[in-house]
């Protein structure tokens, strides 16, 4: 899980999701998981 000020989709499998006010990236590749913070 990477915590970043700006989250971006890295590959075509990355999906940007907003969960309870937090922007997250979910992906098949665990290295691409991100959270805004």
Swiss-Prot record:
Keyword Ribosomal protein listed? The answer is yes
**GO molecular-function terms, A-Z:** structural constituent of ribosome
Among the GO biological process terms of this entry, one is:
translation
The coiled-coil regions, if any, are none
| Statement: the UniProt record of this protein carries the keyword Nucleotide-binding | no
UniProt keyword list: Ribonucleoprotein, Ribosomal protein
Q: Name one GO cellular component term.
A: cytoplasm
Residues annotated as transmembrane:
none
Belongs to which family?
Belongs to the bacterial ribosomal protein bL36 family.
Q: Indicate what this protein is called per its UniProt record.
A: Large ribosomal subunit protein bL36
Record lineage: Bacteria, Bacillati, Mycoplasmatota, Mycoplasmoidales, Mycoplasmoidaceae
């Amino acid at each position: 899980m990477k915590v970043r000020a700006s989250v971006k989709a890295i590959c075509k499998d990355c999906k940007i999701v907003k969960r309870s006010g937090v922007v997250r990236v979910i992906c098949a590749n665990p290295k691409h998981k991100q959270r805004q913070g």
